[in-house]
Amino acid sequence: MELTVATILVTFAGVFLICFMKGAFGGGFSIVGIPLLSMVMDPVTAGGLLAPLFIAMDLFALRYWKPSTWSKPDLFALLPGLVTGIGFGYLLFRFLDHRAIAIAMAAITLIFVALWLIAGAEVTTRPRSTPKAITAGIASGVTTMVAHSGGPPLAMYLLPLGLSKDVYAGTTSLFFTVGNATKAVPWLLLVKPTGNVWTLMALCVLAIPAGVWAGWRLHGSLDQRQIYRLCYGLLVVTALKLLWDGVSGYLV
């Protein structure tokens, strides 16, 4: 990959947007910033670039999403599935049909949002389910490994619980801190970034503090209902991006 001014600026903007999402919603919507990166690099290179950056973003975000914002009962059920899913994703990375996974995840996500809209588009409160949490963790682990999009399975489990906006964001933040730290080494083994990618990575670290802080300020200015509606809206954006990636992959 050639390191040009355009590459640096576009990548910096993409990383800033991802950090903004982590500050505002805790995690899970990183895919929103990936289209910017795809303008200047291929998806595999972007994956290698983001793997270490995600760790730095997550650790910085935990300055805002402290232990008091973590839903520990949910994390206790979710995290083992997450690590297991990442393991499956790594072992099957070269054999899985990433396009089919993207399309299936997009369809499931759009159905989930459609059902929420039909039900009145309000914050709900449903009981916890350990089997659902484990399933969501595994699905998130696989999709975050193969498509950097582990957000939808987690959101489909957490949003119906009606957690407070801070607890929702804090729980997703810690969830993806663990997930991104777990998948960093497998991704670097698969991709092996070049010198230019490491240089670009170092430059993009500068976007992290401002991006996370700006997102956190937005989070503080919105109420529970607004945050949840934005999360559902971002799920639609994420699903459409996954659908495009999957369908266009078959057309190439």
Question: Which stretches of residues belong to each language-model region?
Answer:
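Selective hydrophobic functional segments
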Residues: 49-98, 181-225
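Selected transmembrane alpha-helices and immediately adjacent juxtamembrane segments
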Residues: 1-40, 122-172
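Hydrophobic alpha-helical transmembrane segments in multi-pass integral membrane proteins
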Residues: 46, 87-93, 142-149, 183-186, ...
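Juxtamembrane helix-boundary/capping and inter-helix hinge elements in multi-pass membrane proteins
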Residues: 39-44, 63-72, 159-167, 191-194
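Signature of the 12-TM Major Facilitator Superfamily
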Residues: 45-52, 77, 103, 170-174, ...
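Transmembrane helix exit motif
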Residues: 58-68, 104-129, 216-217, 239-252
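Structural signature of hydrophobic alpha-helical transmembrane segments
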Residues: 7-8, 13, 37-55, 99-109, ...
